Amino acid sequence: MKKKMILGALAILMLLPVHAQIAWKQVEPGVWKGVVGTPEDYSLLDVAAVTPLKESFARLPEVALPALANEIVGSIQDGKTSLRIPLQKKEQLYGFGLNFQTVHQRGKILNLHVDHYGGKDNGRTHAPVPFYISSLGYGVFINSARYLTVYAGSGARKDSPNAPVAKDRNTDKTWTASPYSDAVSTLVPAPGAEIYIFAGPTPMDVFRRYNLFCGGGTLPPRWGL
């Protein structure tokens, strides 16, 4: 009986999420890398095989690691990685790859999945990218080749210090299907993930750092302008 109780307790512990502390390492000026769990060998940066344009980073302003880095939470459960990145009240989000109808991405649920465009900017498109820029002057890139699910300020949590008040949709006219959310929550279907933070100070500087980090990009064809 005692042995069964011990085995049962171990089984329960295995089901509980393992919270990982993220240590940030500067890899380029204004660019930091963090690791949660054990990332897979196959990743977007490995496949792209790009080399950052190191000399060009010197032209950008010196910046410190954004304060929100210390508030990013990573956890692993059932072989999947969850990342939670804080959001401020009026913060706006841009990015996540190709979108045909929208610019502002906060408040959406995105399934970043390479697919034909189905008429909605929901992440299933020709070129989804796990990278976004904040209006506060920082960017986040998740280096995973998996199909990611992103709650871009659209998931409310009971344990949040800013948790919305529970309301009865049948009796309360102020009930909403989209209550306030104070975080970007991303599910990576893998036992680990690499996450990169790009500092600004402006959103344009964030984009410049991301572009330089990914090799500098190429000049688009004239017909694509």
Predicted regions and their residues:
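Catalytic and substrate-binding clefts that recognize carbohydrates or anionic sugar/phosphate headgroups
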Residues: 21-222
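Hydrophobic alpha-helical segments and their boundary regions
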Residues: 6-9, 84-86
